[in-house]
A protein has these predicted regions:
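Adenine nucleotide-associated cytosolic modules
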Residues: 1-268
């Protein structure tokens, strides 16, 4: 059991005051290890809120550098960070918010050669990536490793998210394969309202904290979608498919696949 310092009691007092969280729940948060894949639009708010909450160890994977066009929605990066690796910029802000958080940075692409080795070090994975191939890679790696994860995607004025736990519906239960290259526009082609990234990212952060504290109902076997134009939120039931190629009773995928990177659903 963690012997809380006065500083920690004060820092996390609003969590500790919550009957459903308390000291025990905060201790679980502080012992948690979370991997955030992507330090862009979704990874930014996820990382900031998890750091503020006191997650003990946060890993960040991203091979990109900060671009001026990122600053409209990637709130973890500042103007001074343009040209800096996103993982370095994100680590600086996380440490500024909460110096007690251990940060692991992976300035590299997540692919079939490293995904399982990186993911195995963490208790929960957050998908904040910008393309379908990596989303499928994260899904498959997490299913193979038995790791829970939160999926997120944004485009224009819309967002979607769900949470996977072992035995529940996975990404392939909904979408069997990535769409053909060019079938779905990117945010650089179609645009995205900056605040949408914050809306969805904070939902993913909340799901992560709920997972570790055991509070409430997770978004398992259901896909949450929202349209910011109308502020309509919908929850669509999703079934675990016994015939799923990765999590079904007789899976046909036995290794990780690097799909063509041209098919994107969003840009960081």
């Amino acid at each position: 059991m963690i012997d809380f310092t006065e500083e920690q009691i004060q820092r996390y007092s609003r969590h500790i005051l919550l009957q459903d969280v308390g000291v025990e729940g905060q201790e679980k948060i502080m012992n948690a290890r979370v991997l955030v894949v992507g330090a862009g639009g979704l990874g930014a708010p996820v990382s900031l809120y998890l750091a503020a909450a006191g997650i003990g160890r946060i890993g960040i994977v991203d091979a990109d550098v900060v671009d001026l066009s990122n600053l409209q929605r990637q709130v973890i990066h500042f103007t001074k960070d343009v040209g800096v690796p996103k993982v370095k910029s994100a680590e600086e802000k996380i440490k500024a918010i909460n110096p007690n958080v251990k940060v692991d940075t992976y300035y590299e692409f997540l692919d079939s050669s490293n995904a399982l080795d990186i993911i195995k070090e963490y208790d929960f994975v957050v998908d904040g990536t910008d393309n379908f191939p990596v989303k499928f890679l994260i899904n498959d790696a997490c299913v193979m490793a038995g790791k829970p994860f939160s999926h997120g995607g944004i485009l224009r004025f819309n967002g979607q998210t769900f949470t996977h736990l072992p035995g529940t519906a996975c990404y392939r239960c909904m979408f069997k394969e990535p769409p053909p290259a060019g079938a779905v526009p990117t945010c650089s082609q179609a645009g995205v309202l900056g605040a949408i990234a914050g809306m969805l990212g904070t939902i993913q952060a909340a799901e992560t904290l709920k997972y570790f504290t055991g509070v409430g109902e997770l978004l398992t076997n259901r896909l949450l979608t929202f349209d910011a134009k109308t502020m309509q939120f919908r929850t669509v039931p999703v079934k675990h498919r016994d015939s799923c190629a990765i999590c079904g009773s007789t899976p046909t995928i036995d290794h990780l696949i690097d799909y063509e990177q041209a098919a994107c659903d969003l840009k960081h």
